[in-house]
Design a protein with these regions (language model features):
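Short S/T/G/P-rich N-terminal loop/turn motif that feeds into the first structured element of a domain
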Residues: 1-67, 77-95
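Low-complexity, intrinsically disordered Gly/Pro/Thr-rich segments
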Residues: 69-73
């Protein structure tokens, strides 16, 4: 499994609401249909979120990232994006 975490700090609360609504209704459904395992968006503050995207492998994660390139460029205008990503090292779940 491959995971990508993106931290986004928006210029305003209204920008955050617009982008997260777009993520929920457009980006996530499309990405899930293209092979992403799951996607979650977590609120940090009134203008800050982080997303967690899980993929079966890096190839699929890169394919999904390619689908979002133009959108991410637009989101980055007036926002600060920080990305972390990597292969699952240890996984745990309840028995």
């Amino acid at each position: 499994m491959y995971c990508r975490v993106v931290h986004i700090k928006f210029v305003s609360e209204i920008q955050m609401k617009m982008v997260t609504s777009y993520m929920e209704h457009t980006m996530l459904p499309r990405n899930l249909a293209a092979g992403q395992i799951s996607g979650e968006v977590f609120k940090i503050s009134e203008n800050e979120v982080f997303t967690i995207s899980k993929h079966p492998d890096k190839v699929t994660a890169d394919k999904i990232m390619a689908l979002m390139q133009q959108e991410l460029k637009e989101i980055a205008v007036g926002s600060k994006l920080t990305k972390l990503e990597g292969q699952l090292l240890i996984g745990a779940s309840p028995a």
